[in-house]
Amino acid sequence: MDLNSLPGIVPTSSINILTLSGIVGDSAFVELIVAGKLIFSDSFAVLDGALELWNFGDMVIDAAGDAVAPSCSIRVSADGGGLGVSFIAVVTRIDLDYEGKLPDFNSNFLDSSAVTLAPPGARTALAAVGSDIRETGLPPLSLSFVNDGSDMIPDSMLVEGKLSGAAAVYEFDLPEKPGLYRADLGHRHHFFLVAQLGEHHVIFCRNCMNAPEYIYLRAKVTLQRTRTVNSAMIGGRAKEYDMKLVSEYEVSASGLPESLFIPVSLLPSASSISIDGVPAAVSELKTQLSRESDELFECKFTATLSRNLLTPANAAARSRIFRTQFDPSFN
């Protein structure tokens, strides 16, 4: 990724290889700051006015601690001037090589992951079950702004819940202010990263070892076709609450780093896939080396997304966040 055009929110998997051009001089001094702490500093040789930096994403992961989205800065000083870039790094893909060092993404909400990216003001919902819900009724959920991915700010919003079967459902609008927010309900927690997503998409899945993986892609998504289906027939008649809208999309991405090749290649065989929080299936995946570099690759696949059309809880699914099926592993 080009350091000159680094976005304000970036996945750790995309900053393992950083390039910077237009540097005057034979060397440059580089510093990496994560959550206010200097993590790395060193001098690098400049070749033909360009600089290539490696493994910065791995260093952010090592320094993140319990922060799911730490604030970071990269400073480059050279003879011809300097550059300072600040951004939020999101740990979006769990690599087995780093198991044990990463934040614990498992939560006790009925959601596919403990980190959700969503646009400002989006209508969302979280649901939870458990003995504490049954014993205490409906405790309020607390939503707080998080500073630098770690320090809590006292001001918070309380959200009242509603019973839906055995679950407590909390529906609310996310704040308009971009940033990281934490939802707390007893021992449960969930993070919302509020940002203008643009062409960025988050894929969550469970790999062949049933371990959670998060893949963050900047991709072009083209709708191919939609159809309405009824997933259940009772007494020969379709029930309205089983009505679903099934959409097929062509997803194409280029300039992907080598570190994402294996996770992306294995998507068709992964389970519990969701794209931007919506349950999905991946098929017809094709990959090839990028024309730009042998260290980058391109991919194209068909994503089939299914959304429930009816019931209040499933209406929240259209905000791309609410998980419509119960997953006991999160409770």
Model region roles, listed by residue range:
Residues 1-200:
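Preference for solvent-exposed, low-hydrophobicity sequence contexts
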Residues 2-17, 21-25, 126-142, 187-331:
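Extracellular/virion structural assembly segments
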